[in-house]
Amino acid sequence: LKNIKVIIGGFMSIDGKTAPANRIGRIFTKFMTPQHQKILHRLRASVDAIIIGVDTVLADDPSLTVREVKGKNPIRVVLDSSARTPLTSRILNTEEASTIIVATQKASKEKIEALKSKKVEVIVSSSPERVDLKELTEELKNREIKKVLVEGGGEVRWSFFKENLVDEFFVWIMPYVWGGRNAPTLVDGEGFLKTEDAVPLKLKKMKIVKDILILWFSVKR
């Protein structure tokens, strides 16, 4: 089915949180040196597409372009069931990279038309409620996209793991403790309830860059 490499990754505090409990975004950006930025942007430049969920657009308003290194800009793909991406968001107003919004049947025609007016492509998934990720990866494969980076957030990462679509997983562990029982974690969703259902990983490489530990895993098949 697949023939498309899916890499998932993200940043978390030493206690596994990706943001404080109030979920105010972009919290790790301030801890990153130019050296860290280069590593991240080199990774972005190496993939054909970046996938994020609409919640990440709403919280962080990222541009998802390659800035710190030379390289191509990947296609930006937003999973947005109800077409909630704001028309003012950076992802719709930066022309260096093309954008695809993936909505579902529950998105209103008006919202879809408004997004199309921003000269972005809108794909409507056949699924009524949530974007069908297997269908999406097939669609991307048909466009000759071979390598995808899923940047988040926690619900999106969970959906890819649940559908058994992940090939590689990287984690940046930041030297901070956030705490917060309701703070978001790297992979959220309902979670696996049995040990045998958990996703097994194999550590491929690790490196420390100015107090940030970067771990890179492959998913055991």
Pin down the residues of each PLM region.
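Enzymes that bind and transform nitrogen-containing heteroaromatic metabolites
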Residues: 1-221
